[in-house]
Protein backbone atom coordinates (compact mmCIF):
# COMPACT_ATOMS: atom_id res chain seq x y z
CA UNK A 1 0.00 0.00 0.00
CA UNK A 2 1.06 3.55 -0.61
CA UNK A 3 2.50 5.59 2.20
CA UNK A 4 0.49 8.49 3.58
CA UNK A 5 2.73 11.08 2.03
CA UNK A 6 2.42 12.49 -1.49
CA UNK A 7 1.00 9.90 -3.88
CA UNK A 8 3.34 7.92 -6.12
CA UNK A 9 2.94 9.31 -9.62
CA UNK A 10 4.81 6.58 -11.47
CA UNK A 11 1.55 5.05 -12.70
CA UNK A 12 0.54 5.95 -16.26
CA UNK A 13 -1.58 9.08 -16.39
CA UNK A 14 -5.18 8.77 -17.54
CA UNK A 15 -4.41 10.72 -20.70
CA UNK A 16 -1.26 8.78 -21.46
CA UNK A 17 1.06 11.80 -21.26
CA UNK A 18 1.12 15.07 -19.39
CA UNK A 19 0.84 17.15 -22.53
CA UNK A 20 -2.41 18.53 -23.91
CA UNK A 21 -4.32 16.48 -26.47
CA UNK A 22 -7.83 15.96 -27.76
CA UNK A 23 -8.43 13.46 -24.93
CA UNK A 24 -6.78 15.61 -22.27
CA UNK A 25 -9.10 15.94 -19.24
CA UNK A 26 -7.15 18.98 -17.99
CA UNK A 27 -6.48 21.16 -21.06
CA UNK A 28 -5.98 24.34 -19.00
CA UNK A 29 -3.07 22.71 -17.17
CA UNK A 30 0.36 22.84 -18.76
CA UNK A 31 2.47 19.70 -18.94
CA UNK A 32 4.60 19.41 -15.82
CA UNK A 33 4.93 17.97 -12.35
CA UNK A 34 1.65 19.36 -11.00
CA UNK A 35 -0.44 17.97 -13.83
CA UNK A 36 1.35 14.63 -13.66
CA UNK A 37 0.75 14.48 -9.90
CA UNK A 38 -3.00 14.90 -10.44
CA UNK A 39 -3.29 12.41 -13.29
CA UNK A 40 -1.03 9.88 -11.61
CA UNK A 41 -2.88 10.10 -8.31
CA UNK A 42 -6.33 9.73 -9.84
CA UNK A 43 -5.11 6.81 -11.94
CA UNK A 44 -3.63 5.24 -8.83
CA UNK A 45 -6.75 5.40 -6.65
CA UNK A 46 -9.20 4.43 -9.40
CA UNK A 47 -7.29 1.54 -11.00
CA UNK A 48 -9.62 -1.44 -10.80
CA UNK A 49 -8.06 -4.12 -8.66
CA UNK A 50 -4.94 -2.06 -8.04
CA UNK A 51 -3.05 -2.17 -4.73
CA UNK A 52 -3.94 1.45 -3.94
CA UNK A 53 -7.50 1.52 -5.25
CA UNK A 54 -9.81 3.61 -3.06
CA UNK A 55 -13.53 2.75 -3.15
CA UNK A 56 -15.75 5.54 -4.52
CA UNK A 57 -17.37 6.23 -1.16
CA UNK A 58 -13.96 7.16 0.26
CA UNK A 59 -12.87 9.34 -2.65
CA UNK A 60 -13.38 12.63 -0.83
CA UNK A 61 -11.70 15.82 -2.04
CA UNK A 62 -11.76 19.13 -0.15
CA UNK A 63 -10.97 22.58 -1.48
CA UNK A 64 -10.45 25.95 0.10
CA UNK A 65 -12.27 28.67 -1.84
CA UNK A 66 -10.61 32.10 -1.47
CA UNK A 67 -7.37 32.01 -3.45
CA UNK A 68 -7.90 28.35 -4.35
CA UNK A 69 -11.08 28.22 -6.43
CA UNK A 70 -11.55 31.94 -7.00
CA UNK A 71 -9.36 35.01 -6.59
CA UNK A 72 -8.98 36.71 -3.21
CA UNK A 73 -7.12 39.91 -4.07
CA UNK A 74 -7.09 42.87 -3.66
CA UNK A 75 -9.51 41.69 -0.97
CA UNK A 76 -11.62 38.59 -0.40
CA UNK A 77 -14.80 38.80 -2.46
CA UNK A 78 -17.05 38.42 0.56
CA UNK A 79 -15.24 41.26 2.30
CA UNK A 80 -16.17 43.54 -0.59
CA UNK A 81 -19.79 42.44 -0.13
CA UNK A 82 -19.66 43.24 3.59
CA UNK A 83 -17.83 46.56 3.16
CA UNK A 84 -20.53 47.85 0.84
CA UNK A 85 -23.07 47.08 3.53
CA UNK A 86 -20.94 48.88 6.16
CA UNK A 87 -20.73 51.92 3.89
CA UNK A 88 -24.52 51.95 3.59
CA UNK A 89 -24.80 51.74 7.38
CA UNK A 90 -22.33 54.65 7.81
CA UNK A 91 -24.22 56.75 5.30
CA UNK A 92 -27.38 56.20 7.31
CA UNK A 93 -25.68 56.81 10.70
CA UNK A 94 -22.82 59.39 10.57
CA UNK A 95 -21.67 58.41 14.07
CA UNK A 96 -20.39 55.13 12.65
CA UNK A 97 -17.94 56.94 10.38
CA UNK A 98 -15.47 57.44 13.22
CA UNK A 99 -15.56 53.80 14.37
CA UNK A 100 -13.75 50.84 12.87
CA UNK A 101 -14.47 48.99 10.69
CA UNK A 102 -17.11 51.39 9.38
CA UNK A 103 -14.48 54.14 9.16
CA UNK A 104 -12.21 51.99 7.00
CA UNK A 105 -15.11 50.98 4.77
CA UNK A 106 -16.45 54.51 4.42
CA UNK A 107 -13.04 56.08 3.70
CA UNK A 108 -11.85 53.10 1.62
CA UNK A 109 -8.92 52.55 3.98
CA UNK A 110 -8.17 49.10 2.63
CA UNK A 111 -4.70 49.21 4.18
CA UNK A 112 -6.22 48.84 7.64
CA UNK A 113 -8.45 46.00 6.49
CA UNK A 114 -5.65 44.12 4.74
CA UNK A 115 -3.49 44.62 7.82
CA UNK A 116 -6.06 42.85 9.98
CA UNK A 117 -6.19 39.94 7.52
CA UNK A 118 -2.40 39.71 7.24
CA UNK A 119 -2.02 39.67 11.02
CA UNK A 120 -4.59 36.89 11.21
CA UNK A 121 -2.61 34.77 8.74
CA UNK A 122 0.38 35.16 11.06
CA UNK A 123 -1.57 34.17 14.16
CA UNK A 124 -2.22 37.71 15.47
CA UNK A 125 -5.95 38.22 15.99
CA UNK A 126 -5.62 41.35 18.13
CA UNK A 127 -7.77 43.39 15.73
CA UNK A 128 -10.04 40.65 14.45
CA UNK A 129 -12.56 41.46 17.16
CA UNK A 130 -12.80 45.06 15.96
CA UNK A 131 -13.42 43.92 12.40
CA UNK A 132 -15.86 41.27 13.56
CA UNK A 133 -17.88 43.86 15.49
CA UNK A 134 -18.89 45.41 12.20
CA UNK A 135 -19.03 42.27 10.11
CA UNK A 136 -21.41 40.56 12.52
CA UNK A 137 -23.82 43.49 12.69
CA UNK A 138 -23.88 44.02 8.93
CA UNK A 139 -26.64 41.49 8.34
CA UNK A 140 -28.01 40.96 11.85
CA UNK A 141 -31.77 40.48 11.69
CA UNK A 142 -31.72 39.48 8.01
CA UNK A 143 -33.42 36.21 7.10
CA UNK A 144 -31.39 33.44 5.49
CA UNK A 145 -33.49 33.76 2.33
CA UNK A 146 -32.92 37.50 2.05
CA UNK A 147 -29.20 37.11 2.68
CA UNK A 148 -28.95 34.53 -0.08
CA UNK A 149 -30.77 36.80 -2.52
CA UNK A 150 -28.39 39.69 -1.69
CA UNK A 151 -25.28 37.51 -1.98
CA UNK A 152 -26.41 35.98 -5.26
CA UNK A 153 -27.24 39.38 -6.77
CA UNK A 154 -23.93 40.84 -5.64
CA UNK A 155 -21.88 38.03 -7.17
CA UNK A 156 -23.78 38.21 -10.45
CA UNK A 157 -23.75 41.98 -10.90
CA UNK A 158 -20.56 43.29 -9.24
CA UNK A 159 -17.29 43.49 -11.15
CA UNK A 160 -13.84 42.77 -9.77
CA UNK A 161 -12.06 46.09 -9.09
CA UNK A 162 -8.94 45.31 -11.17
CA UNK A 163 -9.62 42.25 -13.33
CA UNK A 164 -12.55 43.82 -15.17
CA UNK A 165 -14.80 40.78 -14.92
CA UNK A 166 -17.82 39.93 -12.80
CA UNK A 167 -17.13 38.14 -9.55
CA UNK A 168 -19.06 35.18 -10.92
CA UNK A 169 -16.38 34.95 -13.63
CA UNK A 170 -13.45 35.03 -11.17
CA UNK A 171 -13.30 31.27 -10.68
CA UNK A 172 -10.10 29.60 -11.85
CA UNK A 173 -10.70 27.59 -15.04
CA UNK A 174 -8.01 24.98 -14.24
CA UNK A 175 -9.57 24.32 -10.84
CA UNK A 176 -13.04 23.97 -12.34
CA UNK A 177 -11.56 21.43 -14.77
CA UNK A 178 -9.97 19.59 -11.86
CA UNK A 179 -13.28 19.45 -10.00
CA UNK A 180 -15.02 18.01 -13.05
CA UNK A 181 -12.23 15.50 -13.63
CA UNK A 182 -12.43 14.28 -10.05
CA UNK A 183 -16.21 13.98 -10.15
CA UNK A 184 -15.98 11.98 -13.38
CA UNK A 185 -13.70 9.58 -11.51
CA UNK A 186 -16.02 8.97 -8.60
CA UNK A 187 -14.89 11.70 -6.20
CA UNK A 188 -17.18 13.73 -3.98
CA UNK A 189 -15.90 17.32 -3.94
CA UNK A 190 -16.43 19.60 -0.95
CA UNK A 191 -15.62 23.24 -0.31
CA UNK A 192 -14.02 23.77 3.12
CA UNK A 193 -13.47 27.51 3.34
CA UNK A 194 -12.92 30.23 5.88
CA UNK A 195 -15.42 32.23 3.85
CA UNK A 196 -19.09 32.35 4.67
CA UNK A 197 -21.00 29.14 4.02
CA UNK A 198 -24.19 30.95 3.06
CA UNK A 199 -22.30 33.42 0.87
CA UNK A 200 -20.90 30.61 -1.29
CA UNK A 201 -23.93 28.35 -1.46
CA UNK A 202 -25.96 30.31 -4.04
CA UNK A 203 -23.28 29.94 -6.71
CA UNK A 204 -21.36 26.78 -5.79
CA UNK A 205 -23.29 24.56 -8.20
CA UNK A 206 -23.07 26.95 -11.15
CA UNK A 207 -19.42 27.91 -10.66
CA UNK A 208 -17.92 24.65 -9.46
CA UNK A 209 -20.47 21.89 -9.91
CA UNK A 210 -20.49 21.47 -6.12
CA UNK A 211 -23.99 21.20 -4.63
CA UNK A 212 -24.81 23.56 -1.80
CA UNK A 213 -24.99 20.78 0.77
CA UNK A 214 -21.27 20.13 0.21
CA UNK A 215 -20.26 23.67 1.13
CA UNK A 216 -18.51 23.87 4.49
CA UNK A 217 -17.62 27.35 5.71
CA UNK A 218 -17.80 29.93 8.44
CA UNK A 219 -21.24 30.85 9.72
CA UNK A 220 -23.06 33.18 12.04
CA UNK A 221 -25.54 31.98 14.62
CA UNK A 222 -29.14 31.70 13.51
CA UNK A 223 -32.39 31.97 15.44
CA UNK A 224 -35.88 30.75 14.53
CA UNK A 225 -38.19 33.75 14.43
CA UNK A 226 -41.61 34.29 12.87
CA UNK A 227 -41.43 31.15 10.79
CA UNK A 228 -37.95 31.59 9.38
CA UNK A 229 -34.25 31.62 10.27
CA UNK A 230 -32.68 34.99 11.07
CA UNK A 231 -29.02 36.02 11.34
CA UNK A 232 -27.70 36.91 14.79
CA UNK A 233 -24.74 39.22 15.45
CA UNK A 234 -22.52 36.44 16.75
CA UNK A 235 -20.14 33.86 15.30
CA UNK A 236 -21.27 30.27 15.10
CA UNK A 237 -18.20 28.74 13.42
CA UNK A 238 -14.97 30.27 12.07
CA UNK A 239 -13.92 27.57 9.62
CA UNK A 240 -10.20 28.23 9.44
CA UNK A 241 -7.01 26.56 10.61
CA UNK A 242 -7.58 23.65 13.01
CA UNK A 243 -11.34 24.09 12.73
CA UNK A 244 -11.29 22.91 9.10
CA UNK A 245 -10.64 19.22 9.79
CA UNK A 246 -13.15 19.36 12.65
CA UNK A 247 -15.85 20.67 10.33
CA UNK A 248 -14.92 18.29 7.53
CA UNK A 249 -15.24 15.31 9.85
CA UNK A 250 -18.47 16.67 11.33
CA UNK A 251 -20.08 17.08 7.92
CA UNK A 252 -18.49 14.29 5.88
CA UNK A 253 -17.54 11.60 8.39
CA UNK A 254 -14.52 10.59 6.30
CA UNK A 255 -10.95 11.76 5.91
CA UNK A 256 -10.34 13.32 2.50
CA UNK A 257 -7.69 11.76 0.27
CA UNK A 258 -7.15 14.97 -1.70
CA UNK A 259 -6.96 18.53 -0.38
CA UNK A 260 -6.13 21.84 -2.06
CA UNK A 261 -5.47 25.15 -0.33
CA UNK A 262 -3.28 28.23 -0.60
CA UNK A 263 -2.58 29.68 2.86
CA UNK A 264 -1.37 28.82 6.34
CA UNK A 265 -4.99 28.44 7.40
CA UNK A 266 -5.25 25.41 5.12
CA UNK A 267 -2.38 23.48 6.73
CA UNK A 268 -4.52 21.40 9.13
CA UNK A 269 -6.90 20.50 6.29
CA UNK A 270 -3.98 19.35 4.15
CA UNK A 271 -2.51 17.36 7.02
CA UNK A 272 -5.88 15.72 7.65
CA UNK A 273 -5.49 13.73 4.42
CA UNK A 274 -2.65 11.70 5.93
CA UNK A 275 -3.60 8.05 6.39
CA UNK A 276 -1.19 5.13 6.90
CA UNK A 277 -2.90 2.79 4.46
CA UNK A 278 -4.00 5.08 1.63
CA UNK A 279 -2.37 7.44 -0.86
CA UNK A 280 -3.15 11.14 -0.64
CA UNK A 281 -2.56 14.24 -2.69
CA UNK A 282 -2.02 17.65 -1.09
CA UNK A 283 -1.72 20.74 -3.23
CA UNK A 284 -1.00 24.43 -2.67
CA UNK A 285 -1.90 27.10 -5.20
CA UNK A 286 0.98 29.59 -5.50
CA UNK A 287 0.03 33.08 -6.65
CA UNK A 288 3.05 34.10 -8.72
CA UNK A 289 1.51 35.58 -11.88
CA UNK A 290 1.12 39.37 -11.68
CA UNK A 291 0.44 39.60 -15.41
CA UNK A 292 -2.68 37.43 -15.34
CA UNK A 293 -3.71 37.51 -11.69
CA UNK A 294 -1.68 38.51 -8.61
CA UNK A 295 1.74 37.87 -7.06
CA UNK A 296 1.88 37.27 -3.30
CA UNK A 297 2.94 34.77 -0.66
CA UNK A 298 1.85 36.70 2.44
CA UNK A 299 -0.10 34.36 4.66
CA UNK A 300 1.29 31.27 2.93
CA UNK A 301 4.88 31.25 4.18
CA UNK A 302 4.48 28.37 6.63
CA UNK A 303 2.38 26.35 4.19
CA UNK A 304 5.02 26.69 1.47
CA UNK A 305 7.75 25.67 3.90
CA UNK A 306 5.80 22.57 4.90
CA UNK A 307 5.13 21.79 1.26
CA UNK A 308 8.86 21.63 0.65
CA UNK A 309 9.46 19.47 3.70
CA UNK A 310 6.60 17.05 3.08
CA UNK A 311 6.63 16.89 -0.70
CA UNK A 312 3.26 18.51 -1.25
CA UNK A 313 2.51 19.62 -4.80
CA UNK A 314 2.89 23.39 -5.27
CA UNK A 315 0.82 24.60 -8.22
CA UNK A 316 2.35 27.66 -9.87
CA UNK A 317 -0.29 29.81 -11.56
CA UNK A 318 2.41 31.24 -13.80
CA UNK A 319 3.97 27.94 -14.85
CA UNK A 320 1.21 25.34 -14.47
CA UNK A 321 -1.89 27.08 -15.79
CA UNK A 322 -2.26 27.74 -19.51
CA UNK A 323 -5.22 29.97 -18.70
CA UNK A 324 -6.38 31.42 -15.41
CA UNK A 325 -10.06 32.28 -15.86
PLM regions: where:
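A metal-dependent, Asp-based hydrolase signature
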Residues: 74-75, 80-168, 173
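Asp-based phosphoryl-transfer active-site loop
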Residues: 58-74, 270
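Short, solvent-exposed loop/turn elements at domain surfaces
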Residues: 47-48, 70-72, 224-225
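C-terminal cap/substrate-recognition subdomain and adjoining C-terminal extension
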Residues: 2-5, 10-29, 33-39, 43, ...
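Short loop/turn motifs at secondary-structure junctions and domain boundaries
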Residues: 51-55
